[in-house]
Amino acid sequence: KVVNIPEAIVYHRRRTTLLKFFRQVFNWGVARINLGKKNNKMLEPLHFAPAIITIVASLITFYFFVDPINNGRLFELGLGFLMFVSGVGAWYMKDIRGFFLLLFIIPIQIFGYGLGFILAFIHRFIFRRSKWSGFTKSYY
């Protein structure tokens, strides 16, 4: 049962640095795998998207630096998509500064979650080890 309580006060802790934000989303990726290990229904195909994006973007970046002439288009396409999404976010916020912030925040969020998800997936599903916690010290 869901109830709306308009007078309820909800405290939200914002991350004060990009490193703390990275740790937070990394742990979310780890937590999703741990939840999926408890109940398969809590691990849906959509949860794999940041991990897939992390792998594909890493490969595209690697191949761009190996052979920039032949692999430049894919790299440019990825940067163009990032700029488009950042532009949509800035338009939504009605603040141009959001565009420049989102150019950094979006990759940190996707890569942080994706890396946590990938490492926890390998740890729990491939090596069949016990629960893994990710960042535990200096999390916040």
Label the predicted regions.
Residues 38-43, 63, 137-140:
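Low-complexity, flexible helical/coil segments
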Residues 12, 47, 110:
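Histidine-centered active-site/metal-ligand motif
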Residues 50-127:
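Membrane-embedded multi-pass helical conduit in multi-pass membrane proteins
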Residues 124-140:
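Short linear elements at protein peripheries
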Residues 41-52:
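Membrane-interface anchor segments at the N-terminal boundary of transmembrane helices
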Residues 1-43:
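Catalytic donor/gating beta->alpha subdomain of glycosyltransferases that bind UDP-sugars
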